[in-house]
Amino acid sequence: MKALLQRVGAARVEVGGEIVGSIDRGLLVLVGVEPEDGERCAAKMLHKLLNYRVFGDDEGKMNRSLLDVQGGLLLVSQFTLAANTRSGLRPSFSSAAPPAQGEAVFEHLVKLAREAYPQVATGRFGADMQVHLVNDGPVTFLLES
């Protein structure tokens, strides 16, 4: 599983002009599921997302997690993160999980997140989404589990 984590001042996801998920200060996370990923991988990634220290403390050091600052968590599925881009000029998606598996693992991640944390929003799996964000920093990390 790959998760592109971005610290944001605000973010929202629209589908067909309708806002389907939004947060204020927090983390926007684009999630790509790979064939070997399952429920255990989703649990491990959620632990990282909630505890990864990307927010500044009183001295400006990245010592605070999402749990510490009580920000929002916006999870958005993005199968293109799992693409193989090592050769050629066109990405290969053979390294991405099949759609049914990708949806099941992503939805399990969302379920775990909602059970563990009160401020969770999502995009819509498989939809053509427009993602709007105010990237804070910018601070962006690619997490893998």
Swiss-Prot record:
Superkingdom, natural source: Bacteria
Q: Which GO terms describe its biological process?
A: D-amino acid catabolic process; tRNA metabolic process
Sample GO molecular function, one term: D-tyrosyl-tRNA(Tyr) deacylase activity
**Localisation:** Cytoplasm
Annotated motif Gly-cisPro motif, important for rejection of L-amino acids, positions: 137-138
Q: Which reaction does it catalyse?
A: glycyl-tRNA(Ala) + H2O = tRNA(Ala) + glycine + H(+); a D-aminoacyl-tRNA + H2O = a tRNA + a D-alpha-amino acid + H(+)
Q: Name one GO cellular component term.
A: cytoplasm
Respond yes or no to whether keyword Cell membrane is given for this record: no
Q: What is its EC number?
A: 3.1.1.96
Q: Which UniProt keywords apply?
A: Cytoplasm, Hydrolase, RNA-binding, tRNA-binding
Task: Name a Pfam family for this protein.
Answer: Tyr_Deacylase
**Family to which this protein belongs:** Belongs to the DTD family.
Q: What does this protein do?
A: An aminoacyl-tRNA editing enzyme that deacylates mischarged D-aminoacyl-tRNAs. Also deacylates mischarged glycyl-tRNA(Ala), protecting cells against glycine mischarging by AlaRS. Acts via tRNA-based rather than protein-based catalysis; rejects L-amino acids rather than detecting D-amino acids in the active site. By recycling D-aminoacyl-tRNA to D-amino acids and free tRNA molecules, this enzyme counteracts the toxicity associated with the formation of D-aminoacyl-tRNA entities in vivo and helps enforce protein L-homochirality.
Return the HAMAP family for the record. Answer: Deacylase_Dtd
Domain annotation text? A Gly-cisPro motif from one monomer fits into the active site of the other monomer to allow specific chiral rejection of L-amino acids.
Subunit structure and binding partners: Homodimer.
This one is known as: D-aminoacyl-tRNA deacylase
Organism, scientific name:
Pseudomonas aeruginosa (strain ATCC 15692 / DSM 22644 / CIP 104116 / JCM 14847 / LMG 12228 / 1C / PRS 101 / PAO1)
Source lineage: Bacteria, Pseudomonadati, Pseudomonadota, Gammaproteobacteria, Pseudomonadales
